[in-house]
Amino acid sequence: MGLGAAYKEGFRYILDKLDSELIVQMDADHSHQPSEIPNMLEKIKNFDYLIASRHVEGSDIVGWGIGRKATHSVAGVIAKACAKIEINDSTSGFRMFKKKTLERIDFDKIRSDGFAFQIEVLYQLKQLGMKGLEVPTVFVNRTEGSSKMGSSEMMQFITMCISYIGRK
């Protein structure tokens, strides 16, 4: 099961079974800091969703070399242009949603089962007129395991970008 498929299943479960007004999404590899959630709780009041961004003032990325940072930045610029979204860190896995926001996403329309899933969600949120905010985060690269980013992920990203060309 890819990342996007896991998110779809998890979000559907949460929306069906749990009674919570806010949902926090974060990676399980300790790269996101749970200590940042209280700040996010304060900031979401006037927004539909938040992105803990590695690309806003006050953010930091620990454990990435210059090459990884550059690749990530370029991919972010491409995603932003293709999907016509305002978010700078479109692949951040640290997010907070109001439940009513997640309920409006049509997960069946999302084709990507990898990292591009994150961008497709943002595209739908933009189409729905949802209001988002990026907040600074300290991202700590995992100390164990390895990135799942590979040729399959890159192909999904390229396919997604091409599919958005010509859309509003």
Task: Give the positions of each predicted feature.
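Acidic, glycine-rich active-site loops and adjacent beta-strand->loop/helix elements
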Residues: 28-31, 141
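Catalytic donor-sugar/metal-binding loop of nucleotide-sugar-dependent glycosyltransferases
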Residues: 85-86, 109-113, 122-138
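DNA-recognition element of transcription regulators
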Residues: 119
